[in-house]
Design a protein with these regions (language model features):
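Conserved mixed alpha/beta core segments that line enzyme active sites in large multi-domain catalysts
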Residues: 1-37, 92-485
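A conserved helix-loop-beta module that forms one wall/lid of the active-site cleft
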Residues: 4-70, 74-95
């Protein structure tokens, strides 16, 4: 029955890829292993699939097969990629594929859709490919010809992302560079609701069944963790400069890693990602601005009124009240934590491995959440060793640095043979161009040796804002064993 359903929603033929397979397997595990909980609380998905044969047909139709063969050779693996990316972005689709895409759009009507990568190797054990391939939101409004053109552009963008430097280096680092990696696509109706000109889910998040960021010694890593945001899940998946998801350990959801109320406010969500039907694409809106124009958001479940800030706003003539996205009511007065904990533990048991999931939430009139599971994959960042025994009575002169807590990645013991450090004081005095020069130089030094390397630097590694850290790319630091952000 499942295979027949997939076939009825498949454009072309071939494989549907790892991401689509993971989503379907995870949903079936929940419905079969805990039907009494998930049949009423797991929202049905509305997914279509663009098979791997459509990817091959696109390459052949545009005369790109010889270039693909050259790119697969060791000498052409990186050098052929830029021209391939450019050619893919300007390629045309075979008539039979275009016809099936038109039927796909007829099915979705004018609901927003998300075009997601689902390559053959993606989301497999040990190969998360997190953030390496593109996903594209489409408003899906307007004339049929316009909607088809936008869908084709989105598909080209995802296809082209398979030839990005980051993706190619990631595959090579894991010994996958000489294996087939055809790109299938998972096309889904975006889960959410219309709020006037805006479309967004109530909330979205990323959950992991093992908490590798246990900032308190009383927390049980096996209880899991969640990063939760209001609106689209892009702000939960990605590290956004200057804005923060709500991070909760599922065994202590009320315990936050903040020292005072100012930190709690600073490290919270102030911006909301949503689809703007008038602008025609994904937009980011300040929460206060969104609440000025949208009155039917479930704020009573997701936030709390900041009384002091509301009083100050009233005194200077600003509209109120002032809301803070804490998600405390959702945690305290609904089944959210219990349901998410059950979801993660059930999937970990089914996979026989810790898992990483993405989901959206629909909050009903009683304040209870239902889940839409959009992705599930084996958690790729758990430690590679058992418990690590630290040496006792280590002489001070042999200790380079020491830190406790705020560590991610699980237990691991490595013999570090090289340390690269960016001096924070010097870096702070550099201009923007000089900071990009530092990032390029770091990449050059990393690639000079395959030795086990510890990289230490100020702020965030991989930031897109040089004032907040070192703007390296994944390809620059893929060979590093451990990162330290000071």
């Amino acid at each position: 029955e499942d295979l027949l359903t997939i076939r009825s929603r498949l454009v072309g033929s071939g494989y549907i890829g790892g991401k689509a397979t993971g989503m379907l397997i995870a949903r079936n595990i929940l419905l079969q292993d805990a039907p009494e909980l998930w049949q009423p609380n797991l929202e049905p998905h509305d997914s279509s699939y663009l098979g791997t044969d459509a990817y091959y047909a696109f390459l052949v139709h545009n005369g790109l097969w010889p270039a693909i063969m050259r790119q697969r050779s060791p000498e052409g693996y990186l050098s052929e990629a830029p021209s391939l990316r450019k050619a893919i972005l300007t390629g045309q689709f075979p008539a039979e594929v275009r016809s099936e895409l038109e039927r796909l759009l007829d099915h979705y009507g004018q609901y927003p859709i998300l075009v997601r990568s689902s390559s053959l190797q993606e989301d497999g054990f040990g190969n998360a490919f997190a953030g390496k391939y593109d996903s594209v939101f489409l408003i899906n409004q307007g004339a049929p010809e316009q909607r088809l053109a936008e869908l084709e552009n989105a598909i080209r963008q995802v296809y082209a992302s398979s030839m990005s430097d980051d993706a190619l280096v990631y595959r090579k680092q894991r010994g996958l560079d000489q294996r087939e990696e055809p790109m299938a696509l998972l096309i889904q109706r975006v889960n959410g609701r219309f709020h006037g000109r805006y479309y967004l889910p109530d909330a979205a998040g990323v959950g992991v069944s093992r908490n590798t960021f246990a900032w308190d010694s009383t927390m049980n890593p096996k209880a899991g963790m969640v990063r939760l945001v209001m609106g689209l899940g892009t702000r939960a998946v990605d590290r956004i400069e200057g804005d923060h998801a709500c991070v909760m350990a599922l065994d202590h959801p009320g315990r936050q890693p903040f020292r005072n109320p100012d930190e709690h406010y600073r490290f919270s969500q102030h911006l909301v990602d949503l689809l703007d039907l008038q602008e025609g694409h994904l937009e980011t809106r300040p929460l206060s601005q969104l609440l000025d124009t949208v009155q039917d958001l479930p704020m009573a479940q997701m936030g709390e009124i900041d009384r002091a800030a509301s009083t100050r706003a009233e005194q200077i003539g600003l509209p109120g009240p002032v809301w803070r996205l804490t998600f405390r009511p959702l945690v305290q007065f609904s089944s959210f934590i219990q349901r998410l904990s059950s979801l993660l533990s059930t999937l970990e048991a089914g996979y026989q491995h810790p898992v990483d999931v993405e989901f959206t939430l629909h909050i009903d009139e009683q304040g209870e959440p239902s889940f839409n599971l959009v992705q599930c994959r084996p958690l790729a960042t758990i430690g590679e060793t058992g418990p690590v025994t630290l040496p006792e009575h280590l002489p001070a002169e042999r200790e380079i640095f020491r830190t406790q807590g705020h560590f991610m990645g699980g237990n691991i013991s490595l013999a570090i043979t090289r340390v690269i450090r960016v001096d924070a004081a010097i870096y702070a005095n550099l201009n923007i161009n000089q900071r990009y020069d530092v990032a390029r130089r770091v990449g050059e030094v990393v690639r000079e040796s395959s030795a086990s390397t510890l990289l230490i630097g100020p702020g965030r590694w991989g930031t897109s804002s040089p004032e907040l850290g070192v703007p390296v790319r994944f390809a620059d630091i893929a060979g590093v064993s451990a990162l330290v952000e000071v």
